[in-house]
């Protein structure tokens, strides 16, 4: 728990298992963090589980109970069902627009097709792609970071993609990838200068190494101070409860839209 001075009044923010609790003016508010990752073109249910319609229904039900919701995704929207693949994931992007995603990062499978496809997806999207360690012609591919204000709380959001994408994705050579730890330290410093109250990283790194020596979300939490929450993707890990490394909470939601983290 930590006390924060916002607009001249004291606000206490607590990171708990199921959300961010705010105590303000003797009232308790909760900011719900909903997270997905590695959707992989799962427009329709996989083995009768998930699908965009089911996901949208769940998100709507959560929002009906609490208006303070932050909805994010940790990458790999692309490459899965034929209905998505043949349309360059446009159905997925439109579904994300409908569900009201606040921010998405880029996964390695976003580079399975030429870069112009990803650029089209960014144009279709009504949400930002946060790409703190990917550059194109010397500038961030998407946005370097994002600040969302919810319930009077300033939330800084950054995004990272595994540098191993350079080795496993055929079109990754059209952009450059910065070391994940170096990029995270830099963007956390920038967000602190903006006086955000919480810092969330959308990281397509994985709980386990995709290749020897590459950065995982665990290692990032160990090596970079100042990150409150890491929303992870890439390794398709399933964990029922958040992991806590030092002062950082790590969450992930398996794959293919089977789960929505809350």
Sequence positions of predicted segments:
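Acidic, metal/ion-coordinating pockets
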Residues: 8, 20-262
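N-terminal Sec-pathway targeting helices
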Residues: 1-13
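Core hydrophobic alpha-helical membrane-spanning segments
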Residues: 12-20
């Amino acid at each position: 728990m930590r006390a924060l001075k916002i607009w001249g009044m004291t606000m206490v923010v607590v990171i708990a298992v199921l959300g961010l609790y705010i105590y303000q003016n003797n009232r308790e508010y909760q900011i719900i963090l909903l997270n997905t990752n590695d959707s992989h073109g799962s427009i329709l249910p996989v083995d009768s589980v998930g699908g965009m319609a089911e996901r949208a229904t769940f998100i709507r039900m959560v929002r009906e109970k609490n208006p303070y919701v932050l909805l994010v995704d940790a990458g790999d929207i692309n490459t899965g069902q034929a209905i998505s693949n043949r349309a360059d994931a446009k159905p997925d992007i439109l579904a994300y627009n409908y569900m009201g995603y606040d921010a998405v990062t880029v996964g390695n499978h976003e580079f399975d097709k030429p870069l112009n496809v990803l650029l089209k997806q960014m144009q279709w999207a009504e949400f930002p792609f946060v790409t703190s360690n990917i550059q194109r012609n010397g500038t961030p591919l998407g946005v370097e970071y994002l600040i969302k204000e919810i319930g009077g709380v300033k939330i800084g959001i950054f995004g990272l993609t595994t540098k191993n994408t350079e080795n496993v994705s055929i079109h990754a050579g059209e952009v450059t990838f910065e070391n994940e730890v170096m990029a995270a330290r830099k963007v956390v410093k920038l967000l602190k200068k903006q006086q955000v109250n919480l810092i969330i990283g959308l990281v397509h790194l994985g709980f386990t190494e995709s290749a020897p020596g590459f950065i995982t979300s665990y290692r990032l939490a160990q090596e970079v101070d100042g990150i409150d929450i890491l929303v992870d993707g890439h390794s398709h890990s399933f964990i029922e409860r958040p992991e806590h490394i030092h002062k950082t909470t790590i969450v992930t939601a398996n794959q293919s839209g089977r789960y929505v983290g809350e």
